[in-house]
Amino acid sequence: MALRSLFLPNAFPNASSFRGGSRRGAAPRAMPIVMKSNVEVGARNEIAKKPFTPPFEIHEQITHSLPPEKIEIFKSLEGWATDNILIHLRPVEKSWQPQDYLPDPSAESFHDQVKELRQRSKEIPDDYFVALVGDMITEEALPTYQTMLNTLDGVRDETGASLTSWAVWTRAWTAEENRHGDLLNKYLYLTGRVDMRQIEKTIQYLIGSGMDPRTENNPYLGFIYTSFQERATSISHGNTARHAKDYGDLSLAQVCGIIASDEKRHEKAYTKIIEKLFEIDPDATVLAFADMMKKKISMPAHLMYDGRDDNLFKHFSSVAQRLGVYTAKDYADILEFLVERWNVEELTGLSSEGRKAQDYVCTLVPRIRKVDERAQGMAKKGGQTMRFSWIHDREVML
């Protein structure tokens, strides 16, 4: 998934009233477990020196916030998921594989194919490679995303080979996603334009750091997160495909395009899950939607680190924003799409808290667009450059 989302300023209205407390029409949350780090916020340099820890402090982590009766909903939906979610998977024998889009190492013309690929890549600017490498690194952290899905109560793979529809989906989705990082990694390696060792270090750091999507082991929150992220990923890869085409590399455009197509198909599955939850449990679902948007959808790679730059994700996101690969406008567009896709404005019979949550998500898009306008204005005044280790410390504009 590059499961991707932009870093956004903390400028959204507070929705703390959507969390905790009793709710009519929606079961109260289970007593959450709050996990606090023993490292002070701001001690970035000290944290970065410690092995196998994120490059900076993360916030409080809440776990197991879903009441037991809500977990039963997901168990009751296993048959529905078999009929409605697993259909969005492709049989392995009908799936594309990375080798379909790469030079054939068994062919006599292999070296000529590689030379042609490298020649095409020379026409592509460094800032594009920063965006593409960031996407690839995000895809390569797939073990973290499977782990995240298996933290969700009621849908996790309890044995590692469970035959429940939720577990089958998670494993098969992971298997499909695994091709994305493989393909981009090999393609970038063959270009000769990037520092593969620095990229590989970044991947190892990222998988070791994990991710903190703030989904609380709660599948309501988790599937809203994945619905948003899969659409964001499809947009991002679609835009890198468009840029590659503009630069004259039609093969790379095809690579990015086929990945975007996969992400779009996965998005359909996740949005369908939330659609079903809105049908059977609208109050809890709209509360979860507002909760995730209040917390802001963070990119799974927000703990990205290359051993040098503590703010690597922020810098990578700035390049992606400037290039139009993924922007604050896209973030707002995705939210607008999901509000319409799930008919959130039309929900009725909600509790008072549910109506507040409904109003929050339905009026949030214009506020995000204002944030985008300010960000665009700041970008025009910018001119800051940054050296990226991924491209042999060459400078690009942020």
Curated annotation (Swiss-Prot):
Cofactor note: Binds 2 Fe(2+) ions per subunit.
Keywords attached to this entry: Chloroplast, Fatty acid biosynthesis, Fatty acid metabolism, Iron, Lipid biosynthesis, Lipid metabolism, Metal-binding, Oxidoreductase, Plastid, Transit peptide
Pathway membership, UniProt: Lipid metabolism; fatty acid metabolism
GO molecular function: metal ion binding; stearoyl-[ACP] desaturase activity
Enzyme class: oxidoreductase
EC number: 1.14.19.11
Function: Converts palmitoyl-ACP to (4Z)-hexadec-4-enoyl-ACP by introduction of a cis double bond between carbons 4 and 5 of the acyl chain.
Protein name: Palmitoyl-[acyl-carrier-protein] 4-desaturase 3, chloroplastic
Naturally occurring in which organism (per UniProt): Ophrys sphegodes
